[in-house]
Amino acid sequence: MNKQLAKQNEPATLQVIACGALARELMVLLDQLPDGAVSLTCLPAAWHNHPEKIVPGLKRKVVAARRKGMQIAVAYGDCGTGGTLDAFLEAEQIPRIAGPHCYEMFLGKVKFDAEMETALGTFFLTDYMVRHFERIVMKGMGIRQYPGLRDMYFGHYTRVLYIAQTDCKKLRAKARQAAIELGLDYEYRYTGYGDFHGFLSKLA
């Protein structure tokens, strides 16, 4: 997703630049803020598979926002950038939501650490990943075409943990099926929007 998603009633003074995989959740939260307070623009979620594109894409978004005189905040994890994302944001003095990835942002650091201590071999699914599991994992990682890749990629995992942003029976069923596809145990935690709610509320 590479288009601006914004409240239209009034010109926003703050723009959040985010991963497209978070767009649906962030828009729900933005709907709870005063109209026009914050606008949202996203980089493509598919760039998780091409992290070298993230920082250059972010730079372009920052330049565009500053030309409009907007303040900027970022809803991204490191996402495979090897620290270059944080180095850029620090140099530009742009705030980012705390956490290395969205799994910790949804669960919160304490709960995330506890889950990892319970089972280090955890493959996390969010609502977005459940919705797009076939495209991202089964086809995107080549498992549909080459089934032997499943154990190569997931042989060291022990469970799928679906951390849900919404209470949706259909998504729970899809997440359980995803675990079956991967040959892993299945567990479920409802997280809601985790740390993102507080992050956006403070910005507004």
Pin down the residues of each PLM region.
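A conserved mid-domain beta-alpha-beta active-site/ligand-binding segment of alpha/beta enzyme cores
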Residues: 117-171
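Long, charge-dense
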Residues: 83-136
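Glycine-rich, highly charged phosphate/nucleotide-binding loops
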Residues: 51-64
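Short helix-loop-beta junction
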Residues: 31-40, 179-184
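Gly/Ser/Thr-rich loops at beta-strand to alpha-helix junctions
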Residues: 17-24, 47-48, 75-85, 103-105, ...
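A short beta-strand-loop structural module common to alpha/beta enzyme folds
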Residues: 36-54, 188-192
